[in-house]
């Protein structure tokens, strides 16, 4: 190597990817820290996704979201999603973080960052990670309104399993599932009165 050339930095390994689940009371997501984590001299792009609590849904005022999780399983699934993203895209570094507990309107509940030599890989990986987080990580969301509350389904992913038992490669259209449908199908019974 000539004396004026810089060495090419090695890409981070999956062991160096950042996976965080912040327990209730841990405060806001540290967005700058996650972006700094994926920053890499060989990266030409950093793509991010920040999921925030909106202040209204279908005409109702949203006060906050409340998240619960099966922590150990959620952490394992998040790490697996990052491995899947690495296998599908040429990436330098990855980070994903999700808050648990109460997230007021206007604050971030989930953040994804990906760096790559080229923007397409970073952007596609970022989209893949957030889609899979919403589809397959055991984190549940309750939407709290000024006049009530409701546990939310992620409708766009409810019908990802096809009739032959395989998983569809893309999200299902955003439609309301048939009664008794959804991720758990007939395993969940709703008492209607």
UniProtKB/Swiss-Prot annotation:
InterPro entries: MoaE_sf (IPR036563), MOCS2B_euk (IPR028888), Mopterin_biosynth_MoaE (IPR003448)
Low complexity: compositionally biased ranges: 163-178
Assigned keywords, A-Z: Cytoplasm, Molybdenum cofactor biosynthesis, Transferase
Reaction equation(s) it catalyzes: 2 [molybdopterin-synthase sulfur-carrier protein]-C-terminal-Gly-aminoethanethioate + cyclic pyranopterin phosphate + H2O = molybdopterin + 2 [molybdopterin-synthase sulfur-carrier protein]-C-terminal Gly-Gly + 2 H(+)
Subcellular location, record wording: Cytoplasm
GO biological process assignments: Mo-molybdopterin cofactor biosynthetic process
Cited function: Catalytic subunit of the molybdopterin synthase complex, a complex that catalyzes the conversion of precursor Z into molybdopterin. Acts by mediating the incorporation of 2 sulfur atoms from thiocarboxylated MOCS2A into precursor Z to generate a dithiolene group.
Protein name, entry field: Molybdopterin synthase catalytic subunit
